[in-house]
């Protein structure tokens, strides 16, 4: 297309003012507001102008009716909620990009009902004094998992960062070479340790790490032994992995707390449903783990949250750390998580 032809096309392009005065836009202005229609109109005309300069438009593209039709489509698309219902046809049951686990009906109903009114979050209803926003969910988690105490933050990455910052700042954390994981969004265990002020001390090898490797690596500077669930890969073949019970025995002998980053947070025996390799939260605690942390919106089936459970002393240290306030969730998370945990207590599927 020659410059002369391009110039002829550009002269056919209607001006913004002319389009905005068109009676065809009256309904769009009433539906979407004049400012939004004006913004989208300018953006659309700029797009058409750029295509014309590239020789990629026809005369029909420049007709006023065609432009108004496309403007209407742009406005409808703009007004559609970004977060909206979709069909998960990916083959990934708990898809991060699709909201992970759907909430149970009674959980969703509880959210709708309670969010219409003031909700108790952290006030003692008997004394009127400020209480603990954790207490409702913490009590349910104590009953479900056998933990001495529990606290809730915004997600499991936050839980990991908080416990490292609160319990291991400027000290060593022992992790198997085979568990230095990277999950979505380039979240890497070594990076989160550095951010939390802890010093990584990798033990064993990628494919074989024994209890003795941890025992020999322990020192007076060891703040914790961290067991990380490798949820998105498996090391197979010539391998050896230290069990939770063996690891807890090492921790007990060396007087070093053992923390299990469980990732998904399984509350029931999923092996009966065909999903193997997921540790139970209660089993890890009963095996001797001082703390566990896991997600609320994966296998647990609740809202996005990070749960830290176990030793009351260590949980309290996490609560007292300055990062805790920055990571604590709001009422929607507590309502949804609490109702989800009640479903488990009632033994429902």
Go through the PLM ranges and name each one.
Residues 1-76:
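Long amphipathic alpha-helical segments
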Residues 13-14, 32, 87-91, 300-303:
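Short Gly/Ser/Thr- and Asp/Glu-enriched loop/turn motifs at secondary-structure junctions
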Residues 348-349:
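Helix-rich C-terminal "cap"/substrate-channel and partner-interaction subdomain
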Residues 46, 89-90, 100-126:
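Glycine-rich phosphate-binding segment of PLP-dependent enzymes
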